[in-house]
């Protein structure tokens, strides 16, 4: 596996990102692997490696970069858990879609990535982000998964369900 730790430039700063893909072959379809609330950490890097081993270019970014360079919750520390909830509250679908645009632009510029075939996966906090991204980039997002996603259909202007008709790819909600 090829692995890189890079910063992707966004309008709001540098987004720390882990990218992994197979050593040979390609170009590989892209997977935007969105963090869950505890943050970008080695556990997620391992999951990204498993996905990339099956033939994908996986992009795992720290979505909390606007506030912290890196974050991993320490569940035994109440202050760390409180910080996690504060960081979560600073994200919304539109911000994460802007981040996804930067991730996709980076992948599109990389010859080993096929940014015309994109999958997005989100767990819990990032489940609605995955669906929003599917609606925001319907021509390239071929699949999106929201696993135990929260706030998928709520009485809010940015509820992902309001954009269901814009999603052209396969959608998995579980």
Please tell me what each predicted stretch does.
Residues 1-174:
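N-terminal cap/leader regions of alpha/beta-hydrolase-fold enzymes
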